[in-house]
Swiss-Prot record:
GO terms, biological process: anterograde axonal transport; mitochondrial outer membrane permeabilization involved in programmed cell death; mitochondrial protein processing; mitochondrion organization; regulation of calcium import into the mitochondrion; regulation of mitochondrial membrane permeability
UniProt source species: Rattus norvegicus
GO cellular component: axon cytoplasm; m-AAA complex; mitochondrial inner membrane; mitochondrial permeability transition pore complex; mitochondrion
Any one Pfam family match given in the protein's UniProt record, by short name: AAA
Function noted in UniProt: Catalytic component of the m-AAA protease, a protease that plays a key role in proteostasis of inner mitochondrial membrane proteins, and which is essential for axonal and neuron development. SPG7 possesses both ATPase and protease activities: the ATPase activity is required to unfold substrates, threading them into the internal proteolytic cavity for hydrolysis into small peptide fragments.
Cellular compartment(s): Mitochondrion inner membrane
Xref: InterPro entries: AAA+_ATPase, AAA_lid_3, ATP-dep_Zn_Metalloprotease, ATPase_AAA_core, FtsH, P-loop_NTPase, Pept_M41_FtsH_extracell, Peptidase_M41
Subunit structure: Forms heterooligomers with AFG3L2; the m-AAA protease is composed of heterohexamers of AFG3L2 and SPG7. Component of the mitochondrial permeability transition pore complex (mPTPC), at least composed of SPG7, VDAC1 and PPIF. Interacts with MAIP1.
Protein name per Swiss-Prot or TrEMBL: Mitochondrial inner membrane m-AAA protease component paraplegin
Active site: residue positions: E575
Length: 781
């Protein structure tokens, strides 16, 4: 604090503005002393200004120099050593110092030469403003250096303390070796301060720290304990350690705490003052960068990027967003009819369906600026940044209007605001959401700024965000249909080198992948190409796609996991039970492949089915799906008279289907045609249920009856076909993998007619037929 007061006093006495005058006054020299004599060329001053000052004397300036010189030199050396500042010249520039100094005569000559000749008044005003900005920058840099010097001085004073020691270390390492100079007792804190001789050797090394603190249990008997230790060490009376008592008192401690608090508050005030200078020249840009929205600008006029032709499928969604593109291209066509284009659109749908890809296509097709930003980038740990970034984003959008603002994963900032009854509240997120609502449809809303947002959690969005006037156009992007999957495969297969035309694979792959998203389809095509490259093929073949589909569905085969003979038999009968029940029942899907090879997704085996693109299910179809899922557990119980934990996933699926039939689909006669929302995982017990406890017990009872009836039916089917179950299990134990043709050869065709299937083996046969016509021969899978 004394150093700070002295520095301020010297600053007030400085005759001219600028930091170098201050350093010159503190050192007792004038700027002319550092220049060449007469008209000689000035030279660059090496070293710090404080380091050039005289160290002697007892003036306030010399005292301040002795305090601040080590700190300044330490900070300068650290910045240069760590390469934080590239050179000493740059360090002088940052600290506001002057590199070149002239004599007074040369300085006056330069002023005369630099006088403007025939300048306009506005040029003089601009020159005056430039000098004011430079002076402001100098003052801010000097204040920054002043704070660094004070902090380093405090740290330097604290560095003389060597920390805490124990009584044993004090006696054995210090007292016994004669390194203790004096001892000071602080009774109020039960602390003893031990001062050592300069150059003392402690723990085998010379120590720079000369003061150590020691906690004492009974401070009143410390001196008695010290004298007893000296007696044991045979220390003579003249060499005994002097003991003094330090009583600070209440006012001393209070003044010390008040002083440290004042220093901390002053530093905080200065930091926030710098933050308030953002936006003006001379201010620190770091605070301004925090408040700026980190968005990505896509210029659609360049023609580079994703177009609607590159987005396969999503026909209805593209029609919805094309209206925004048409409005931005030719708004007069809409305005002359009095139409108002929606302010924004919300893209909804499961993950991986192409919401972000569609937004990129809009950016290219609209040929207007496209400002994209992710929802999580708004909210930070510092309060108020989210709202500031929203304002910054829309300010930039208005300046570039007409334009499109795209917010990805808007659920990060658009969650429903908490009510007074709930204790889960996030003020920062709510403030960000409120600012977003105002910018989208508030008093200062500007036209020609369209907002697009995407999320896969529309249920958590605030109602005010979804109302007409904001995100009033809701575009739902569902999982692709069979035709859309074929188009997506065609799009991704264009970049692959194939043995057959892309149309040969696209239809079959689309039928193999019901329920797959666009991201899953892209992953399959990429995995097929990677597998072909690993195998050393020059093009992608059918079995590469077969491997890719199997890898995405069940994972890769884990050859390092070796099962015992008994476990292999259990897995074989388990998977055979699934396959046999699915083969014999009427409303089940075709079994494409059965494998007992362990997989990386923790599955010991799997049965690959070919589900249909179906949107309506009857009670009989759902019941037989439950029977097929229970086929593995029933086969284990029949074959081994015991069950294992391998059916855990099957039981989970059966339970979900049973409760859906009872609670949502109204398929339980005793419950009636009612439907209740599905309970969300992780929220059990939170909120009120829309049914009574008695009705809950009735639904539980109906679900148990439904599962029990499905299990009995599954057991009956397997008991009536034990020979077929045994044949399938033996084939699996022998080959590990069997397909549709193998099952048909073992147990005959399905009793309810052939099931629809797409066997990859037929693709290979088609390739072989083409090879016979003279084309390149495909390697064996």
């Amino acid at each position: 604090m004394a150093a700070a007061l002295l520095l301020l006093r010297a600053l007030r006495q400085s005759p001219e503005p600028g930091p170098w005058r201050l350093w010159a006054q503190l050192s007792g020299r004038s700027p002319g002393l550092f220049s060449g004599a007469g008209g000689r060329r000035p030279y660059v001053v090496r070293g710090t200004p404080i380091g050039l000052a005289a160290a002697g004397g007892h003036t306030p300036q010399s005292l301040l120099l002795r305090i601040l010189t080590p700190s300044f030199e330490g900070v300068s050396g650290l910045l240069l050593k760590r390469h934080i500042v590239p050179s000493a010249i740059r360090l002088w520039q940052l600290s506001g110092s002057t590199l070149y100094f002239n004599t007074s005569g040369l300085k006056q000559k330069n002023k005369d030469d630099d006088k403007p000749k025939g300048k306009a008044p506005e040029d003089d005003e601009e020159e005056r403003r430039r000098k004011e900005r430079e002076d402001q920058m100098y003052r801010e840099r000097l204040r920054t250096l002043f704070i660094i010097a004070i902090v380093m001085s405090l740290l330097n004073s604290l560095s003389t303390s060597g920390g805490s020691i124990s009584w044993a270390d004090f006696v054995n390492e210090m007292l016994a070796k004669g390194e203790v100079q004096r001892v000071q007792v602080v009774p109020e804190s039960d602390v003893v301060e031990v001062y050592l001789h300069p150059g003392a050797v402690v723990f085998g090394r010379p120590r720079l720290a000369l003061m150590y603190r020691m906690q004492v249990a009974n401070i009143d008997k410390f001196e008695e304990k010290l004298r007893a230790a000296e007696d044991e060490l045979n220390i003579e009376s003249k060499d005994r350690i002097p003991v003094s008592y330090k009583r600070t008192g209440f006012f001393g401690n209070a003044l010390y705490a008040l002083g440290m608090t004042a220093v901390g508050l002053a530093i905080l005030w200065y930091v926030f003052r710098l933050a308030g200078m953002t936006g003006r020249e001379g201010g620190f840009s770091a605070f301004n960068q925090l408040k700026m929205a980190r968005f990505t600008i896509v210029d659609g006029k360049t023609g580079k990027g994703v177009s609607f032709q590159d987005v396969a499928g999503m026909h209805e969604a593209k029609l919805e967003v094309r209206e925004f593109v048409d409005y931005l291209k030719s708004p007069e066509r809409f305005l002359q009819l009095g139409a108002k284009v929606p302010k924004g659109a919300l893209l909804l749908g499961p993950p991986g369906c192409g919401k972000t890809l569609l937004a990129k296509a809009v950016a290219t097709e609209a040929q207007v600026p496209f400002l994209a930003m992710a929802g999580p980038e708004f909210v930070e740990v510092i309060g108020g940044l989210g709202a500031a970034r929203v304002r910054s984003l829309f300010k930039e959008a208005r300046a570039r209007a007409p334009c499109i603002v795209y917010i990805d994963e808007i659920d990060a900032v658009g969650k429903k605001r908490s009510t007074s009854m709930s204790g889960f509240s996030n003020t920062e997120e709510e403030q960000t959401l409120n600012q977003l609502l105002v910018e989208m449809d508030g008093m200062g809303t500007a036209d020609h700024v369209i907002v697009l947002a995407s999320t896969n959690r529309a249920d958590v969005l605030d109602n005010a965000l979804m109302r007409p006037g904001r995100l009033d156009r809701h575009v739902f992007i569902d999982l692709p249909t069979l035709q859309e999957r074929r188009e997506i495969f065609e799009q991704h297969l264009k970049g692959l080198k194939l043995t057959q035309p892309s149309s040969f694979y696209s239809q079959r792959l689309a039928e193999l992948t019901p329920g797959f998203s666009g991201a899953d389809i892209a992953n399959i095509c990429n995995e097929a190409a990677l597998h072909a490259a690993r195998e050393g093929h020059t093009s992608v073949h059918t079995f590469n796609f077969e491997y890719a589909v199997e890898r995405v569905i069940a994972g890769t085969a884990k050859k390092s996991k070796i099962l015992s003979k008994e476990e292999q038999r259990v897995v074989a009968f388990h998977e055979s039970g699934h396959a046999l029940v699915g083969w014999l029942l009427e409303h089940t899907e075709a079994v494409m492949k059965v494998s007992i090879a362990p997989r990386t997704n923790a599955a010991l085996g799997f049965s690959q089915m070919l589900p249909r693109d179906q949107y309506l299910f009857t009670k009989e179809q759902l019941f037989e799906r439950m029977c097929m899922a229970l086929g593995g557990r029933a086969a284990e119980a029949i074959s081994f008279s015991r069950v294992t934990s391998g059916a855990q996933d099957d039981l989970r699926k059966v339970t979900r289907i049973a409760y859906s039939m009872v609670k949502q689909f109204g398929m339980a006669p005793s419950i009636g045609p009612v439907s209740f929302p599905e309970a969300q995982e992780g929220l059990v017990g939170i909120g009120r249920r829309p049914f009574s406890q008695g009705l809950q017990q009735m639904m539980d009872h109906e679900a148990r009856l439904l599962v029990a009836r499905a299990y009995r039916h599954t057991e009956k089917v397997l008991l009536d076909n034990l020979d077929k179950l045994q044949a399938l299990a033996n084939a699996l134990l022998e080959k590990e993998v069997i397909n549709y043709e193998d099952i048909e050869a073992l147990i005959g065709p399905p009793p309810h007619g052939p099931k629809k299937m797409i066997a990859p083996q037929k693709w290979i046969d088609a390739e072989k037929e083409k090879q016979a016509s003279g084309e390149e021969e495909a390697p064996a899978p």
